[in-house]
Amino acid sequence: MGNRHGIMRPRRLASGRSAAAAEEEGEDGEGEPGSYEAACSADPELGTFDTALRRRASRAITAVASGVEVRSLSLGSLREVTGCLLDMNQEVVRVVLACKRDVWRSPDLFDLVEDYFEGSLHTLDFLAALDKSLHRARDSQLVLHLAVQRHHHEPPAAAAASASELYASTLGELRQFKAAGEPFTDEFFAAFQTVYRQQMSMVGKLRRRKRRLDRRLRSVRVWRRVSGIVFLTAFAALLVCSVVAAAIAAPPVAAALAPAASMPVGSAGKWMDSLLKKYQDALHGHKEVVSAMQVGTFIAIKDLDSIRVLVEHLEVQISSMADSVEFAERDEEAVRFGIDEVKKKLELFMKSVDDLGEQADRNNMRLCHILPEYVFFINPANGNGMSESLFEMMNAFHDICRKDIKFKTSHYYLNFLSSSYQVYIAVA
């Protein structure tokens, strides 16, 4: 049914994915100086993040893999992978907020973090397109439900008196379902591809930034070692020469200098080391933010691939019911048989649509929790002011919540409004 109506499929993602893979392979060929495993061992917080990430990703991958084995991916798998995606996004927000002052001091890293959160705008567009598709699917579901109800609950006397009118009415409703076409339209797949391309682009930016940070960290470690050795050696040599000169000119002064000779060396060494350590700590903070965004983006790409497969699975169900409608168009006996087939498949279709709708609601609710934290992150107190993208995100999110009473009464929505109000006051 989907191919007959000319609905755009996300096949173009394959070429984009191949190009991105080739780019990543080229980057890998250069070799990354840093070791993620070593970083996890050295940094307890990063190790905890990695453990939680692996657990979430493993659960999502297992859910999808179990569906692949039986050639049937359920909406439960969709809930698992999208839940993993949004949990990862919240974790990234937590890491970024913890390092926000270091991020503000680095314009490049600030822009990178802002690009990452601007991806939430594309996610909102994707969820809005999904919501429209679900409304169309529910409308089609209602048409089929009415056709089945009329055919099976018509009084026997009325059915005998006007059988032809009954079949004509039923057939008309079945044709109305067929004419509605695919609920997943070009808009849905366009929004999907926009999110996917943005995530793939983010991967490239994060990898390049991480390599630069790795090189700087390696250099800073060498600087601390070499500068410490050279500086302290030179300082010690100066003290030795001073003591020698004093010994020649005034032996009692040399005797007094000898016990205190190590004190200035230690103080100077601590001073030099503290300067380099501050720089190294700042680089570590930057790298932690980049690593969190890099892992979150990678998981997002895998989850989007899984969502695409699950949407195609739902389309197969719709196409199967459309085939039953086509069969019912042959004659009155075929109408009766076609209605029975549609009734069998309608229950599964209704459950799939309802489950997908519930998942979309949960995704929106989680975004209600993520975006206020982003508002606090891009706080005008940092001197950069509020960007147009932030206002756009706030307005888009407000419009989505305003249209649904469930969101308007949720504490997430109220939290978002409170955060937005504080930002507007700060700007004014």
Curated annotation (Swiss-Prot):
Assigned keywords, A-Z: Membrane, Transmembrane, Transmembrane helix
| Statement: the UniProt record of this protein carries the keyword Disulfide bond | no
The membrane-spanning stretches of this chain are 229-249, 252-272
**Presence of the UniProt keyword Disulfide bond in the record:** no
Q: Which domain of life is it from?
A: Eukaryota
The record ties this protein, via Pfam families, to: DUF677
Per its record, how is this protein called by name?
Answer: Putative UPF0496 protein 5
Subcellular location per the Swiss-Prot or TrEMBL entry = Membrane
Q: Compositional bias of type Basic residues: which residue ranges?
A: 1-14
Start and end residues of each stretch annotated as Disordered: 1-40
